């Protein structure tokens, strides 16, 4: 199938082939648009531009659907662990059985330790340095320790690179946190599961099982591990978002893969991307009380007020974000099973959602809750500090970045990314 482009100035007609998709709309192949017509396409923000063909994840914004390699996100969250999803994203296959799942997870556990020299680098940062700045730097430094990943040729090379960074990113994030608060570094405990280890390194005390709560001392519960596991799965990948596209763009230059991942971390830092869940919680704090919700909703509608309601709306989803639905259910489940929630903030969030889902202003603009709206409330209940919400996002998303990077570098169509511009200067 082809599409005809007509130049109305001279009535010249140009034929462009279309590219079929297995899900979603077709694409018109404009790769030779300039060569054929003398024109560039102009698409600020690339909202109508496909920069690649991918088999990793698919988002149906109208229907509110998300798939990882053909599997519905609802099924993956319900039936599989995060490490199984990691294997799916990196290899295209879920574990066939428990033994295969454990084998993959044990590899991640054993690769989770980091070179001691990194500790000196982290200690050199000011104590108030943002953890995302430190984490991005730490991943970049990893490229100096594993220089062989600069030249990958076999599938084993690719998988080693990806699994190494997926294994180490929780350790780096935990070091960033404990360095900031002045607590001793806790090394990975390979006897713990991959996900439990993350909570242990963030929350635990040295040389002992976790003892942290405001009401008596209890260890990490299986319920907490399960909840955190689901959060990581929900954040593992999301098609060509800003950070994933950044990873692909930087990787296209031939740079060390960990430098590309570092760039992805920097992109995720922004409050319009990964930093949004932190902003949601801070905004709920600002609202302060259920009785103030109407006032803030009115501010959203006021054309003279720049106030924006965080956690609502999405560039792709024009319906309820499926990840937000899962997180809302998870929040309710945790509350019912006795996990302590911030009742005040939960009530404010529920009231905001109740009003927004019925208000014509939000409905007309397709402003529905997104993944950030409830994730912060749950992370706080899991005793994750607010400043470390975005690093948690990094932990979950690193495997998706690796999958995107590998898909790009292994593609015979891969080229250095070089967008055009419409010059309007003197």
Curated annotation (Swiss-Prot):
Keyword Transferase: yes
Taxonomic superkingdom: Bacteria
Gene3D superfamilies noted in UniProt: 2.20.28.60, Citrate Synthase, domain 1 (1.10.580.10), Cytochrome P450-Terp, domain 2 (1.10.230.10)
Record-level Gene Ontology MF annotations: citrate (Si)-synthase activity
EC class: transferase
Reaction catalysed by this enzyme: oxaloacetate + acetyl-CoA + H2O = citrate + CoA + H(+)
Active site residues of this protein: 314, 372
Keywords: Transferase, Tricarboxylic acid cycle
InterPro entries documented for this protein: Citrate_synth-like_lrg_a-sub, Citrate_synth-like_sm_a-sub, Citrate_synthase, Citrate_synthase_AS, Citrate_synthase_bac-typ, Citrate_synthase_sf, Citrate_synthase_typ-I
Pathway(s) annotated for this protein in UniProt: Carbohydrate metabolism; tricarboxylic acid cycle; isocitrate from oxaloacetate: step 1/2
GO process annotations (BP): tricarboxylic acid cycle
GO cellular component, one term: cytoplasm
Transmembrane segments: none
E.C. code: 2.3.3.16
Family according to the record: Belongs to the citrate synthase family.
Further remarks about this protein from its record: Citrate synthase is found in nearly all cells capable of oxidative metabolism.
Record protein name field: Citrate synthase
